[in-house]
């Protein structure tokens, strides 16, 4: 006699939390800012914004969803901006090309991390 077996459905849950979203690089010549998740969990970009020094230009990063651990998002600007792979186009005008400009990443809690370009 065979005993029937049942298998409960498997639920895979992706944990999205604060993660550890950071600015990894700001390249004023290439007009690129690289944002990445340095944490061990998926990090939602909801509530994160990126702006230049003086806040003349600002972008809501939440529109790009979330980042897996070690995943990057390259925010491109300028005439040669492109959206391939992990790259997204912010603007087709130069943002970071002036001397002494700074990329500022604002977290949902209002804390800021900045990196000179």
List PLM regions with ranges.
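Activation on beta-sandwich/Ig-like modules and their edge loops
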Residues: 1-117
